[in-house]
């Protein structure tokens, strides 16, 4: 299609979208097209700007789009951050962090038989140029799973952002085994309930599996709930683990982190009625605020979404902190404490 015709069609599409009374004016929404999934990923505060990636679908497959803001209200659209190619055939959920040398680094779940847990790095101020690693840091034997030398399967989907602790890098991977094993083969106790898998590295290239990160407790979650899209970080004098189960949406644990293990003390949900609050992602800014987003399901059918020519809405950003009673508090950034 000639470029001038593309411009005319794009302008016409923008006019249609701007006239949609159901399209939010102040939430982050998909620029156009039905985005399923629309997970926020790779959140990072970098050189005075809040950067947020999210999954979109193009002719090439699942990609990461990229937006940034100085004030969490006005957002700039950047070129796509990650596209399929090389070892992967699609880009699924992951996180972002700044390594010990100051390099912004993305972790993501690369789709395809030669992929797994993958990384990419950027060295430009706008984070517009990302270079993928030549090979996965953890290869998947099948989609979302790796197999240890003793034959034990371990989930390797939806990696968390990497963090540095006591001289090592650490990373969590999602518990896809609940879906693969327990949902299909009822009664396998070893695959019941949410958990995560902890990996450790000294160089961000070679990773060793340590053990399950925490023990799931049935008084809080159901046996058929997985743990995916994990986001783990310090909050006050505790640590918080944000995650989803695919059947009940966004939830969290607050607890203690020591000796490479997490001990949940309390549990809460951010989807009180359904699972429409989904796929959480957070960052910490220069003021020390822990700010999160999530994907909000519109609650409409695929046919309605395709007729509207778009789908994909983010929650408003919210700051998280602990109250004096060690329970979770949250508020829009403008109304939150200065540093939490």
Where are these regions (language model features)?
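Beta-rich carbohydrate-recognition and catalytic domains
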Residues: 1-228, 234-274, 287, 294-340
């Amino acid at each position: 299609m000639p470029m001038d015709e593309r411009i005319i069609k794009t302008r016409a599409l923008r006019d249609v979208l701007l006239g949609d009374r159901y399209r939010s004016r102040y939430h982050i929404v998909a620029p156009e097209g039905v985005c399923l999934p629309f997970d926020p990923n790779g959140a990072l505060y970098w050189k005075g700007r809040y950067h947020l990636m999210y999954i979109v679908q193009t002719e090439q497959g699942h990609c990461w789009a990229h937006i940034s803001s100085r004030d969490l209200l006005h957002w700039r659209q950047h070129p796509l951050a990650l596209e399929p190619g090389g070892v992967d055939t699609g880009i699924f959920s992951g996180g972002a962090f700044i390594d010990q040398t100051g390099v912004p680094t993305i972790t993501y779940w690369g789709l395809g038989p030669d992929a797994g847990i993958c990384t990419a790095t950027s060295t430009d101020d706008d984070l517009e140029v990302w270079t993928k690693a030549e090979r996965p840091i953890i290869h998947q034997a099948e989609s979302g799973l790796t197999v240890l030398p003793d034959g034990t399967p371990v989930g390797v989907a939806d990696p968390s952002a990497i963090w540095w602790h006591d001289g090592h890098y650490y990373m969590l991977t999602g518990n896809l085994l609940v879906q693969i094993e327990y949902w299909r083969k009822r009664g396998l106790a070893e695959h019941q309930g949410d958990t995560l898998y902890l990996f450790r590295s000294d160089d961000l290239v070679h990773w060793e599996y340590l053990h399950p990160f925490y023990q799931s407790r049935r008084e809080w979650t159901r046996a058929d709930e997985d743990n995916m899209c994990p986001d783990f970080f310090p909050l006050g004098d505790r640590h918080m683990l944000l995650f989803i189960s695919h059947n009940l949406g966004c939830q969290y644990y607050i607890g203690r982190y020591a000796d490479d293990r997490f001990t949940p003390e309390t549990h809460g949900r951010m989807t009180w009625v359904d699972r429409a609050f989904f796929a959480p992602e957070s960052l910490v800014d220069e003021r020390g605020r822990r700010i999160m987003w999530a994907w909000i399901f519109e609650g409409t059918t695929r046919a309605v979404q395709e007729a509207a020519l778009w789908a994909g809405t983010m929650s408003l950003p919210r700051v998280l902190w602990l109250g004096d009673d060690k329970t979770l508090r949250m508020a829009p950034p403008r109304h939150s404490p200065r540093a939490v």
